[in-house]
């Protein structure tokens, strides 16, 4: 049974995130002791609450972040602060894919990127979870959205999410997109660049960012952590900004709660629709 501020949840759905894969390889910053159960986040129904839980009750439909592991299970105990009411506009599968991706996008574009209406946003890895969330949020904020990726067929889907333009990052196995981005932004470059990829994509990004632009470092899905020639941000007047959405909320709980509330309010407008490409039973 849950004690203190714990909440016992019957898991309805759990999502697979890139950090789950990294944890199995020992490459993620959070390194749980072996053995452990995978699963960073999910959705479900509260079964019981601890004796000091205030804002949640039995029967509530919720999303949860399990502090790194444990979501791939039938039941899970999670501290109250990691549990939020499920947006009514989302089903359980969509809700299981909601928290990490959309919170990352919100903290990146709004809190750290200071995205303004009408600005151009270059979203790398746009066909992945955090990229999809960024495309949808940027469009909700009335920005010009340029989505990038390595598969043209997958990129076409991003138009449904709000992408105004799609750009392949690779041309014959060479990362080359700077000229296309400049053409789409009247030679200026993107005002905000959202980069969960790193590597060669980062190297090319610093060549197509606008004066005063914000390059948001979200992750390194390419496998290579890049280094930047610091004369570039000096000459072009842009900022390189690191984003850790979870840590942002832990260090400033008030703003963290505001962020969580904001993404739920936007979800209820219908602007956020997590795309589920495949579902598996827990036995699989």
Q: At which residue positions do the language-model features occur?
A:
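N-terminal Rossmann NAD(P)H-binding glycine-rich loop of SDR-like oxidoreductase domains
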Residues: 127, 135
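Short glycine-centered segments of the SAM/dcSAM-binding site in methyltransferase folds
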Residues: 61, 120, 144, 213-214, ...
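NAD(P)H dinucleotide-binding glycine-rich loop of Rossmann-like/cofactor-binding domains
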Residues: 22, 64-125, 172
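Glycine-rich phosphate-binding loop and adjacent beta-alpha segment
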Residues: 149, 158, 200-272
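Glycine-rich beta-strand-centered segment in the early N-terminal region that forms part
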Residues: 1-16, 27-70
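Hydrophobic/small residue at the entry helix of a nucleotide-binding pocket
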Residues: 104, 129-130, 200
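Adenosine-nucleotide cofactor-binding segment
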Residues: 139-201, 252-258
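Short, well-ordered loop/turn sites that connect or cap secondary structure elements
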Residues: 56-57, 115, 209
């Amino acid at each position: 049974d849950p004690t203190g501020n714990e909440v016992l949840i019957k898991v309805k759905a759990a999502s697979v995130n890139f950090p789950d894969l990294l944890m199995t390889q020992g490459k993620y910053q959070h390194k749980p002791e072996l053995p452990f159960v995978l699963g960073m986040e999910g959705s479900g129904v509260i079964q019981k609450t601890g004796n000091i839980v205030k804002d949640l009750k039995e029967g509530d439909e919720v999303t949860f972040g399990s502090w790194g592991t444990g979501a791939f299970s039938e039941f899970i105990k999670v501290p109250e602060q990691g549990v939020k009411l499920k947006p009514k506009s989302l089903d359980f599968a969509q809700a299981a894919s909601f928290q990490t991706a959309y919170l990352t996008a919100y903290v990146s574009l709004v809190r750290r990127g200071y995205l303004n209406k009408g600005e151009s946003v270059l979203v790398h890895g746009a066909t992945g979870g955090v990229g999809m969330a960024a495309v949808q949020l940027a469009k909700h904020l009335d920005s010009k959205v340029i989505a990038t990726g390595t598969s043209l067929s997958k990129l076409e889907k991003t138009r449904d999410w709000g992408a105004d333009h799609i750009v392949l990052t690779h041309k014959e196995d060479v990362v080359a997109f700077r000229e296309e981005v400049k053409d789409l932004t009247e030679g200026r470059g993107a005002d905000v660049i959202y980069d969960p990829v790193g590597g060669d994509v980062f190297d090319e990004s610093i060549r197509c960012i606008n004066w005063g632009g914000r390059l948001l470092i979200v992750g390194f899905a390419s496998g290579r952590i890049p280094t930047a020639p610091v004369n570039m941000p000096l000459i072009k007047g842009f900022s390189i900004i690191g984003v850790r959405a979870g840590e942002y909320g832990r260090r400033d709980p008030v703003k963290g709660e505001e962020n969580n509330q904001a993404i739920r309010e936007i979800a209820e407008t219908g602007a956020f629709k997590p795309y589920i490409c495949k579902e598996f039973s827990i036995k699989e």
